Amino acid sequence: MNLRSLFAAFYSIYLSVLGVLFKPVKPKNHLTLLVSFEENAQALIRSYKAHAESLSYEVTVLYTRHAVSLKKELEGVGSFYVNEKHPLHLLKAVLILFKSKVVITDNYFLMTSVLNRRPQTTCIQVWHANGSLKKFGLEDVTNQNRPASDISRFKKVYRSFDFVTVGSDAMADVFKKSFGIRDGQLLKTGVPLTDVYYEEHKPELKHKWPKKIILYAPTFRDYDMQSFRLPFTEEQLTNALNGEYMLLVKLHPAVLQHISASFESELIKNVSDMRLHDLLKAADILITDYSSVPFEFALLNKPIFFFTYDLEEYDQKRGLIDNYTSVIPGKACHDSEALLEEMTKKPFRAEEMKRFSDKWNMYSDGNSSEALLKFAETKMKNCAEAPA
């Protein structure tokens, strides 16, 4: 057992002790959001504020360091910043979970495992993506190198999910394999983070740059966090693309903290601190790789290109979905020249993009947050307290 697995084992034991300690706590009409991404939480908080008068419960947000940008949304709701490595933070967070009849989370949190033997609290997983091009959970290829104790711990967390929200039947199939869940656990409410793409507001960021916008939003490589590759150089933007485009780069938070050298220039800007949905709305073109961002951007029916310079390596080390190249709405381009060929010489296939979006966003209709909050309301009313 490596050091990381050993730490996780002690972490799990500590959580189990807290679970026993707080078992007598009776839940109230309270909904807790446990989040490490801002997108779903932002949508749910805004919807809650808009419909609070018709809902019987209060909301508390537990957020980690990757979701600190949520602070501006938290007025009017309870909140607590959780350092997952701080024992007292964990103690308070678990107590808040136990005081709630409904918990909604957006990621893998070991602390939800304490809810496994707590039928009076419903745990709903909304996940942080409305589609997936890479394998995760029980399907993750790195599991083959992990000790059995790790896999057992993962399953313990997945068993804490009473329900998982889905935006499509395609993603439902992914979740069933990745989390080991059944059809009866699937909530076809759509995915809250997609609601914003149905709002008819003009892109707020469009005026910031005088040129057309290419947004580059790559996923992270957990086996190489210190480097990333840009799809175009300043010279290519100037000459091959006639200086018509700005290249905006949105890096994953996990990568950003490892990148020290600046890559910015006149036509290349780092926009990693800006909200994804604002950038997607402003962008004319998206370039990505194995990220889940295309599933959101497809709702806007604009061109997507795939810069997959390390496709074979990524598939071997991290694991892509089966038939990746036939699933994506476009060609997998191994270098900048292939990207330029696709961008400058191939017409945009709007119908193909719409089919892709319809397949992966079939239940996301712009009202997913409201639908999920209404479902939580029914669980509040039907929640029976565990016997003493």
For each of these PLM feature ranges, what is it?
Residues 39-52, 177-178, 186-261, 333, ...:
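Conserved catalytic-core segment of nucleotide-activated headgroup transferases in glycan assembly
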Residues 103-104, 162-168, 248, 286-287:
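A short beta-strand/loop micro-motif in the catalytic core of glycosyltransferases
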Residues 82-98, 253-295:
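Donor nucleotide-activated moiety binding/catalytic core segment of transferases
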Residues 2-20, 133-135, 139-225, 253-256, ...:
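A nucleotide-sugar donor-handling region in carbohydrate enzymes
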Residues 292-360:
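Catalytic binding pocket for nucleotide-activated donors in carbohydrate/polymer assembly enzymes
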Residues 78-147:
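Extended catalytic core of nucleotide-activated donor transferases of GT-like folds
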Residues 1-91:
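N-terminal pre-catalytic "stem/leader" segment of glycosyltransferase-like enzymes
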Residues 102-109, 114-116, 124-127, 274-318:
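A donor-sugar binding/catalytic signature common to diverse glycosyltransferases
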